[in-house]
């Protein structure tokens, strides 16, 4: 049974489960459930024993100390998308708008064997691990390699379908040999791992130095897809030259601009509303001038403020809540049928997407035709 906590779904929270506690939209905390521990927030403390046994997605509420108010959090099951929002950042990460598009363009499936160069914080590694057959991830920085290895073991990825190796692929290539610093487990007579990759993702400062090393580790019997993740257009330019030199085709560069839009209703303001607003401004201006004149003539006393507005006979007016379409007055509930509304949208203020250029290319190493296999495919389609 797989120990990968990102590969399936569970109904109930159990002892030792990795959970993601949603405090707010910008504050999601990964927490391992242990009955004797407590999750502390600025709103209050949430004992783990009160969370264990509840269904995933539950709202956990507590009474705040010294008041009758309640604080609450939601306990969610980890997914690669939520992990991207909550993980500890060791480097810049690939956010979901980019990662989902890359996997779709490279036709990732349980059949895929993927090379990822540049493990970093492991955001994309978790997305790959959920969807592909096997992931070979490479990280040149030793401390980040050890941190990622420990994290992958804790999440059950190493025991499932992920291999991570400490290697500068720009200098040493992608071959995994016995004696290398890697999580790969070699067989008795095995001296090198067979990668046979059909998907390659390069998140490197200089992908053009790594591309020449790919021919020895990619599949020769099927179409191989490649994506280079580059922040600068100058990197793309250098990468294109090397891709052409080493026989990669169908090259295309894409930039993802993922944005979320908030939908709401806004009241339609008429010309009469605008005219009334101008009259109101003028009326208040004249009242202010009149009040300053009376103050100058010492005709206003200390009780004048309390009396407020009066009519022509000097009788105080009763204040009524009036609707003002320009922001002042009584509050009107959005969608009130007594007023006219229109649908509007507003783009989110903060865009959580690491802006980079995605360079896609494909390569077929063995272009010879296997007539026997072609005939077999044709016969199967005729049926």
From Swiss-Prot:
This is tRNA (adenine(58)-N(1))-methyltransferase catalytic subunit TRM61. One of its GO terms (cellular component) is nucleus. The gene is GCD14. It is an enzyme of class 2 (transferase). Its main location: nucleus. PROSITE patterns: SAM_TRM61. S-adenosyl-L-methionine binds at residues 94, 121-124, 139, 144, 168-169, 203. Belongs to the class I-like SAM-binding methyltransferase superfamily. TRM61 family. Gene3D superfamilies: 3.10.330.20, Vaccinia Virus protein VP39. Heterotetramer; composed of two copies of TRM6/GCD10 and two copies of TRM61/GCD14. It comes from the Eukaryota. The modification Phosphoserine is found at residue 302. GO terms for biological process: tRNA methylation. Its EC number is 2.1.1.220. It comes from Saccharomyces cerevisiae (strain ATCC 204508 / S288c).
């Amino acid at each position: 049974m797989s120990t990968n906590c990102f590969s399936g779904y569970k109904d109930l929270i159990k002892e030792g489960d990795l959970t993601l506690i949603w405090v707010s939209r910008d504050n999601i905390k990964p927490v391992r459930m242990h009955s004797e521990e407590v999750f502390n927030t600025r709103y209050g403390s949430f004992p783990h024993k009160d969370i264990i046994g509840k269904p995933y997605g539950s709202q956990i509420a507590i009474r705040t100390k010294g008041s009758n108010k309640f604080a609450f959090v939601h306990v969610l099951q980890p997914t690669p998308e939520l992990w991207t929002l909550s993980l500890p950042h060791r480097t810049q990460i690939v956010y979901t708008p980019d990662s989902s598009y890359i996997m779709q363009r490279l036709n990732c499936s349980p059949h895929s064997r993927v090379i990822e160069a540049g493990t970093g914080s492991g955001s994309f590694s978790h997305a790959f691990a959920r969807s592909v057959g096997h992931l070979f991830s490479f990280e040149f920085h030793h401390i980040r390699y050890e941190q990622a290895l420990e994290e992958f073991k804790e999440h059950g990825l190493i025991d499932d379908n992920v291999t991570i190796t400490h290697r500068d692929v720009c200098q040493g290539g992608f071959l995994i040999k016995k004696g290398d610093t890697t999580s790969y487990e070699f067989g008795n007579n095995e001296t090198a791992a067979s990668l046979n990759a059909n998907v390659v993702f390069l998140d490197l400062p200089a992908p053009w130095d790594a591309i020449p090393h790919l021919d020895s580790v990619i599949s020769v019997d099927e179409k191989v897809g490649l994506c280079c993740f580059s922040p600068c257009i100058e990197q793309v330019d250098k990468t294109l030259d090397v891709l052409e030199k080493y026989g990669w085709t169908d090259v295309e560069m894409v930039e993802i601009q993922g944005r979320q839009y908030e939908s709401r209703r806004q009241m339609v303001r008429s010309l009469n509303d605008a005219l009334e607003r101008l009259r109101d401004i003028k009326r208040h201006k004249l009242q202010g001038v009149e009040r300053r004149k009376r103050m100058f003539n010492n005709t206003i006393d200390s009780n004048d403020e309390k009396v407020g507005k009066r009519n022509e006979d000097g009788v105080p007016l009763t204040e009524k809540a009036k609707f003002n379409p320009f922001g002042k007055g009584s509050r009107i509930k959005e969608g009130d049928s007594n007023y006219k509304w229109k649908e509007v949208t507003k783009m989110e203020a903060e865009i959580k997407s690491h802006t980079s250029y995605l360079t896609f290319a494909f390569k077929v190493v063995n272009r010879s035709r296997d007539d026997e296999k072609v005939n077999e495919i044709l016969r199967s389609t005729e049926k």
